[in-house]
């Protein structure tokens, strides 16, 4: 038989390690201003040197989109900032920007934020005739020497509804169904116990 004290230690250990599991995900919420000049479908970007200088995530008709980039974590590339353009956003909407990486890669994500690039402004070798929203972050290696030079990082752009990111909805639905199932299956027993007390 398991002793209650052992169960308490087991639960305490799990709660302690949850902080480490959460360490490989960083996220922020961003609300597009109501007067932000959105790109029209006929608008196009003009690039000074290379089309692929800035990666982008597009939400055209989707509630969630993601891309995988590879970040260089060698000592020459430390403190190098990654830029990703957020495309096809809607005014006055809130989005969650989530950066995830595998826990086997000892890295940290710092300075996760959004920036706005005004129209006709050259930025990282690109220029556009519309204002752009970019997410930026720095990848830092937590081990020396770096065990993996190129680390895959997944960046997700998720629409929020009622203040909740839509990727969490399936989990919430399952939890509500489980609780409802427990209530339905336990209700006759609880009602019977209450009637027996009277």
From Swiss-Prot:
Q: Which GO terms describe its molecular function?
A: mannosyltransferase activity
Which residue ranges does the entry give as Cytoplasmic-facing topology?
A: 185-198
Signal peptide position in this chain?
1-23
How does the protein associate with the membrane?
A: Single-pass membrane protein
The entry's keywords: Endoplasmic reticulum, Glycoprotein, Glycosyltransferase, GPI-anchor biosynthesis, Membrane, Signal, Transferase, Transmembrane, Transmembrane helix
The residue ranges for the Lumenal side of the membrane come to: 24-163
One GO CC term on file: endoplasmic reticulum membrane
| Residues bearing carbohydrate | 72, 80
Mind listing the GO biological process terms from this record?
fungal-type cell wall organization; GPI anchor biosynthetic process; protein mannosylation
Family matches, as Pfam families: Pga1 (PF10333)
Location(s) in or outside the cell:
Endoplasmic reticulum membrane
Its primary localisation, in coarse terms, equals endoplasmic reticulum
Transmembrane portions of the chain: 164-184
Q: So, what pathway does this thing act in?
A: Glycolipid biosynthesis; glycosylphosphatidylinositol-anchor biosynthesis
* InterPro entries according to UniProt: GPI_ManTrfase_II_coact_Pga1
**Misc note:** Present with 6940 molecules/cell in log phase SD medium.
Q: What role does it play?
A: Essential component of the GPI mannosyltransferase 2 complex. Responsible for the transfer of the second mannose to the glycosylphosphatidylinositol during GPI precursor assembly.
Q: What is this protein called in UniProt?
A: GPI mannosyltransferase 2 subunit PGA1
**What organism is recorded for this protein?**
Saccharomyces cerevisiae (strain ATCC 204508 / S288c) (Baker's yeast)
């Amino acid at each position: 038989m398991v002793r209650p004290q052992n169960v308490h230690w087991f639960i305490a250990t799990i709660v302690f390690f949850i902080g480490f599991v959460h360490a490989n995900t960083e996220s922020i919420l961003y609300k597009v201003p109501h007067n932000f000049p959105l790109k029209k479908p006929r608008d196009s970007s003009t690039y000074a040197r290379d089309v692929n200088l800035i990666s982008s995530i597009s939400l055209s008709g989707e509630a969630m989109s993601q891309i995988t980039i590879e970040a260089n974590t060698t000592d020459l590339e430390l403190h190098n900032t990654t830029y990703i353009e957020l495309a096809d956003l809607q005014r006055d909407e809130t989005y969650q920007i989530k950066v995830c990486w595998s826990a086997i890669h000892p890295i940290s994500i710092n300075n996760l934020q959004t920036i706005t690039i005004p129209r006709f402004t050259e930025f990282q070798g690109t220029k556009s005739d519309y204002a752009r929203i970019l997410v930026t972050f720095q990848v830092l290696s937590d081990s020396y020497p770096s065990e993996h030079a190129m680390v895959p990082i997944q960046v997700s752009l998720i629409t929020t509804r009622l203040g909740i990111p839509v990727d969490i909805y399936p989990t919430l639905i399952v939890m509500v169904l489980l609780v409802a199932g427990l209530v339905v299956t336990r209700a006759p027993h609880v009602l019977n116990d209450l009637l027996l007390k009277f």
